[in-house]
Design a protein with these regions (language model features):
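Vicinal oxygen chelate
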Residues: 2-9, 122-166
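Short secondary-structure junctions
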Residues: 38-43, 132-135
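Conserved short beta-strand elements that form part of the metal-binding/catalytic scaffold
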Residues: 41-102, 154-160
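Short, conserved charged micro-motifs
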Residues: 28-29, 115-121
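Amphipathic alpha-helical segments
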Residues: 25-40
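N-terminal beta-strand motif that seeds the catalytic metal site of vicinal oxygen chelate
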Residues: 2-28, 105-110, 161-166
Length: 166
C-alpha cells in the first residue's frame, strides 16, 4: 500500500545570492569596479573581493585561487573555476601564436529601474573611457547597455522591461 503522506513543498528560491567572475588581477579589477560603478567592497582578500548590490553579491575571484577546497571549522567551500588546462590558457598572455589573450568573457547583468537610468549609466561609462560594446532596446520597453571590464567580461546594465518578471 502506498504512503498517503505527502512531502511538504520545497521553500521557494527567491534570487541569485552570488554572481562570481574570474579575474587575472584582483586588485586592478576591484579598483575598476569601485571606480567605474562607484561600489565599495565589503570584503577583500588576495583570493576574493566581494561587492554588495542590494540583496545580491558580486564576487571577483583571482584566477587560479579557487582550484582547491577551502576548509573551515563550520564546513567546506568546494573548489570551482576553470580546469587546469583552461586556467593555463587564460593565464597565458597570448595563445602561443602572438594572438590576443584568451578570455572567459563571462556575462552578468546589473539592474536599474528605468531606460533613462540606463542612459545615465551609458553617459557615465563613456565619460570614464570604458569600452562600450552595444546597446539594446527590448520589446517590453526595457533598455540595456553592454560594456567590457578589464578581463573582457561582458557587463550589462538593464532596466525593467527586459524580461516578463523584470
Amino acid at each position: 500500500m502506498a504512503s498517503t503522506t505527502a512531502n511538504p513543498p520545497l521553500p521557494p528560491l527567491t534570487h541569485i545570492l552570488e554572481t562570481c567572475i574570474y579575474v587575472r588581477d584582483i586588485a586592478a579589477s576591484a579598483k575598476f569596479y569601485q571606480e567605474t560603478l562607484g561600489i565599495a567592497p565589503f570584503f577583500e582578500s588576495p583570493r576574493v573581493t566581494g561587492f554588495s548590490l542590494g540583496v545580491t553579491t558580486l564576487l571577483l575571484f583571482e584566477l587560479g585561487q579557487t582550484n582547491s577546497d577551502v576548509h573551515t571549522p563550520t564546513g567546506t567551500i568546494p573548489h570551482h573555476g576553470p580546469s587546469p588546462r583552461v586556467l593555463a590558457s587564460l593565464q597565458d598572455k597570448t595563445d602561443g601564436h602572438g594572438e590576443e589573450e584568451q578570455s572567459l568573457k563571462q556575462h552578468f547583468c546589473l539592474a536599474v529601474q528605468s531606460p533613462e537610468q540606463v542612459e545615465q549609466w551609458e553617459g557615465h561609462l563613456q565619460a570614464k573611457g570604458v569600452k562600450l560594446l552595444s546597446r539594446m532596446g527590448w520589446e517590453r520597453g526595457g533598455k540595456s547597455v553592454y560594456f567590457e571590464d578589464l578581463d573582457g567580461h561582458v557587463v550589462e546594465i538593464a532596466s525593467r522591461g527586459v524580461w516578463p518578471h523584470y
